[in-house]
C-alpha cells in the first residue's frame, strides 16, 4: 500500500515538474502571450467587461468598466496600441462613477484586421463614431492618446454634438514633420526596438533578448497595418491645425514634459489653437504618460471630467 502511495506521489511530483518546465519554456518562447494572458485575467478578476460589437460589418472588440448608468467616457488608443493601454487610467474614472468604454481600433488588439481597410485616422474616426452608434452612445466625453488623440480631434470637429468634453493625451494631429524614423514603429531588430523605447520613455529599461524577440514577432504580425496608418498620416491630408480653433467644447490637453515623439512645443501650439483648452504638463513623463504617470494624472483627468 505504501509503495503504491509513494509511486502515486512520485508521478504527481513528476507531472508538476513537467508542467513547470513546459510553462517555463513557453514563457521563454512567447513572453508576450503570457503577459496578455495575465492582463486578460486581471480584467476578469476586476470586473472589466470584454465584449465585441459589429461596426460597419466589422467585429470591434472593446473593454468597459464602471457603473452602467454613469456618464460615458470613450478612450481611444494610439498607433500599435490596444484597449488595454488605458488599464492604469480607466480605473480612476470608473471609481469616480463614469462608464468607461475602450475600443480596439480596427486592425488592433482583438478587433478585426480587414485587408481592404485604409487604416487612416479619418476612417478610424468613422469606426469610433460607428462604435458609439452601435452602443447607443449619443454624447460622450471623448479621450484619445497619440494617434488616438488625432482620431478624437476629427470626431470632435466633424460631430461636435456627440462630444461634450475632449481629452487629448500627447496627441497627434498637427502638421509637423517627425524628426525621428517612422519605421521604428515596426522594429525588426532588438536595436531598433531599443531606439523606439528611447523615443517612448525618458528612462527606458533594458529589454531581455527573449522578450525583445517576441515583441518584434508580435508587432510584425500586424506591422502592415501600422505601416499603412503611418503612410496615411504622413500625407498630412487629415491634419487638424485649421479646424481645432472651431472646437467649442471644453478641452483638456495632457502632456509628458519629456515626450520625444511629440515634443512639448506641440502641446503649447495646440493650447494656443484651442482658446478654451486647459493644458496639464507632467514633469519627467514621456509619450507613455497615461500609462506610466497615472498617479499624478488620474485625479486631474477625473476633475476635468466632473466639471
Model-derived regions: residue spans:
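Catalytic active-site module of serine/aspartate enzymes centered on a nucleophile-bearing elbow/loop
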Residues: 277-307
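An N-terminal hydrophobic leader/cap segment in hydrolases
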Residues: 17-52
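Conserved HGGG/HGGXW glycine-rich cap/lid loop of the alpha/beta-hydrolase fold
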Residues: 65-110
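Conserved alpha/beta-hydrolase catalytic His-Asp/Glu region
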Residues: 29-34, 184-248
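Active-site loop/oxyanion-hole signature of alpha/beta-hydrolase fold enzymes
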Residues: 53-58, 63, 95, 101-143
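Short beta-strand/loop motif that positions the catalytic acidic residue
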Residues: 247, 253-255, 259
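Flexible "cap/lid" loop of the alpha/beta hydrolase fold
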Residues: 150-158, 163-194
